[in-house]
Amino acid sequence: MPLFGAHMSAAGGVSNAIRDIVEIGGEVLQLFTANQRQWTPKAPSAADVEAFRRRRAAFGGPVFSHASYLINIANGDGAASAKAVEALVREFERCTALGVDAVVLHPGAHLGAGRGAGILRAARNIDEVFDRCGGQTPALLLENTAGQGTCLGGGLNDLAEIIDASRHASQLGVCLDTAHAFGAGYALHTDEGYRRCMEDIEYGPGLAAVRLFHVNDSLVPCGSRKDRHTHIGEGQLGEAAFVRLLNDPVFAMHPMVLETPKEDGHAADRRNLATLRRLAGR
């Protein structure tokens, strides 16, 4: 069966995210390692890093970081591009200190320069990040998008082309978000739509490249090019889409993280985790 978890807040210290994922019964954690709304956020203190590593050892599950939404790795503007690279380097440094397994990153927007130019710029900027970090670094997982505006990643081949264009392809992978895929036009709630999505993965980045799922239902219709998450089974995707994914033997042991609303805090996460486990036949 897949491993189920959630994105948890690191308010009050990153080690609190580990505490909270254990408290809700999660098996995998995603978090922001610093304030994702700031370009130069404060890094976790040495004491918090130590507490995180101690709790993480007891937790035992995979841990992923989500890079700041401010980072546009496909930006071709010199100053903006350098700022994005610097922010991702700092993210890698924090994740290395914490022992995080991989960083999730949106592939960015080409801002009118064109898809091809954006893909090449994303690959070059990613290469610069790995070149600067050197040695042992977390993996970098490119997340698909709903394809809004000039964002890359609506088509899964965008991710494949970024990976292929990078000198560090062996350190890159894919995070597949169900709500984003649905918004981009993959009808995951139907047999044919699910098959098409899996074929695009297989003949694009490759099934082995998928290392993480964001499991989110969608408030908006298939192909809307919008990104609006809701609780599992309560949106346009519906429970049938998740039954199909959660019971696909190809992804039997994959980590799957909720990014669903938390209007009543941890209670919402517990309900969504229970729904996922029920749909997976646990």
From Swiss-Prot:
Binds 3 Zn(2+) ions. Zn(2+) 3 binds at H180, D227, H229. One of its GO terms (biological process) is base-excision repair. One of its GO terms (molecular function) is zinc ion binding. InterPro entries: AP_endonuc_2, AP_endonuc_F2_Zn_BS, Xyl_isomerase-like_sf, Xyl_isomerase-like_TIM-brl. Its cofactor is Zn(2+). Keywords: DNA damage, DNA repair, Endonuclease, Hydrolase, Metal-binding, Nuclease, Zinc. Belongs to the AP endonuclease 2 family. NCBIfam families: nfo (TIGR00587). This is Probable endonuclease 4.
